[in-house]
Amino acid sequence: MNSIVNITPIIIILSEHSSEHTFGFNSDIFEANVINILLLLFGLIYVLKQSLGSTLNERQLKVLAAIQESEERLEQASSRLSESEKQLAQTQIIINQIKKEAQLTAEKVRSSILAQGQIDIERLAITGKSNIETAEKQIRRQIQQQIAFLALKKVTLQLENQMSSDIQLRIIDNNIAKLGDQL
């Protein structure tokens, strides 16, 4: 309102100056609707400021929620990874124990074989080797299963983190197209 009071002397000067040069300027503020235009302009600025402010606040809240959700998923993935690493370490310990036990068993078998004679040595050596191979095969199988399990778990975690809806739709469309070709 203070700016309107400051504008009034300028308008009066312009109207006096314009009357000398045949340029018409209406100095009556009420007749020229200057107040209405200013009120409309200030109202429009106020409404737009509130509208844009609330929109920006909503967008900020959405971004913060998305960041928080991503951080939670990262924490979950990290805890799963550390758990998998612990399981792998435990598996390595078990493998080492089994190897030590196999070595101890082999040494005991060798001692008893030497005491019983050459014939028993050959027979027990064959049996011992067979047992060791079987144990190694089982251990290898268990290790392979554990490694495959951990690898699948890691790949699953990576797929869950990287798989977007666009990729899923492309995979589904590709499979549908393949089925259509087969029919």
From Swiss-Prot:
It is a single-pass membrane protein. GO terms for molecular function: ATP binding; proton-transporting ATP synthase activity, rotational mechanism. The keyword Metal-binding does not apply. The chain crosses the membrane at residues 28-48. It is found in: Plastid, Chloroplast thylakoid membrane. InterPro entries: ATP_synth_b/b'su_bac/chlpt. Disulfide bonds: none annotated. Keywords: ATP synthesis, ATP-binding, CF(0), Chloroplast, Hydrogen ion transport, Ion transport, Membrane, Nucleotide-binding, Plastid, Thylakoid, Transmembrane, Transmembrane helix, Transport. In plastids the F-type ATPase is also known as CF(1)CF(0). F-type ATPases have 2 components, F(1) - the catalytic core - and F(0) - the membrane proton channel. F(1) has five subunits: alpha(3), beta(3), gamma(1), delta(1), epsilon(1). F(0) has four main subunits: a(1), b(1), b'(1) and c(10-14). The alpha and beta chains form an alternating ring which encloses part of the gamma chain. F(1) is attached to F(0) by a central stalk formed by the gamma and epsilon chains, while a peripheral stalk is formed by the delta, b and b' chains. F(1)F(0) ATP synthase produces ATP from ADP in the presence of a proton or sodium gradient. F-type ATPases consist of two structural domains, F(1) containing the extramembraneous catalytic core and F(0) containing the membrane proton channel, linked together by a central stalk and a peripheral stalk. During catalysis, ATP synthesis in the catalytic domain of F(1) is coupled via a rotary mechanism of the central stalk subunits to proton translocation. Belongs to the ATPase B chain family. This is ATP synthase subunit b, chloroplastic. It comes from Porphyra purpurea (Red seaweed). The lineage of its organism: Eukaryota, Rhodophyta, Bangiophyceae, Bangiales, Bangiaceae.
